[in-house]
Amino acid sequence: MDWYEKWFGKEYILVYHHRNESEAKQQVDFLLNHISISKNAKILDLCCGNGRHSIALKKLGYDVLGVDLSSELLDIARSKASESNLDLKLYRCDMREIPYENEFDLVVQFFTSFGYFDTDAENQKVLFAISKALKENGQFMIDYMNPDYVMDNLVEKDEKQISAEISIIQERWIENSRINKKITMIKNGETLFYNESVRMYSLQEIKCMLNQAGLMLNKTYGNFDGSEYNKDSMRMILIGSKNP
């Protein structure tokens, strides 16, 4: 089983509990301030997880589809949407194989959901799938890490006490252009192990991959505050469109 098939569930939510609805709303506000779409736009939230951004967009009246591989996270998204009386469309599939063509005005991918696969060819398939799913002149936003920032600010090990019953140890290292993480979780006396491994692409590498997929990069931001992208930026936020 690949790491991303095992990891994205309730334990993942515990580790990233600070990634909440308030943060999602701020990021959606940034998105809509930097992309022009109609009020009835069709939006694909690719790797939607527990639905934070899908729900924020749906509350604004957009026609949203959330897609993820994790049944567990989709169930959480479904429950959260129901609590808000939202009829949110959710679909389970691999991001390389989304079955849509010329369907969406906008595809978004938040919080480093690109670079999961072992080879560049497999990661490239994600961009081909995004391009295929977009309408002509459709737009995309990919929220990705800045490899320079990751390398310069790597915390090799940290420990967190999430609650009286849950503690987490995270160990990080860079190898073969990938940022790797081992997560050890002690939960109610039980020790659980998980991993993350994400390919670190430079901006130039991603530009080439986008071009191969028929996508044009129009603007790169360094964070959700709208700052310009540079080597010290925390994020690499890519905004662009499908070539006509």
Spans of features found by a protein language model:
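Conserved class I S-adenosyl-L-methionine
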Residues: 1-41
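A short acidic, Gly/Pro-enriched loop at the edge of an enzyme's catalytic core
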Residues: 96-106
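A short glycine-rich, Lys/Arg-flanked "PGG" loop and its adjoining helix->strand segment in the class I
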Residues: 124-136
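SAM-dependent methyltransferase
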Residues: 141-209
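C-terminal lobe and adjacent flexible extensions of AdoMet/dcAdoMet transferase-like proteins
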Residues: 205-244
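Class I SAM-dependent methyltransferase "Motif I" SAM/SAH-binding loop
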Residues: 47-51
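A short SAM/SAH-binding and catalytic strip from SAM-dependent methyltransferases
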Residues: 105-121
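Class I SAM-dependent methyltransferase SAM/SAH-binding core
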Residues: 52-97
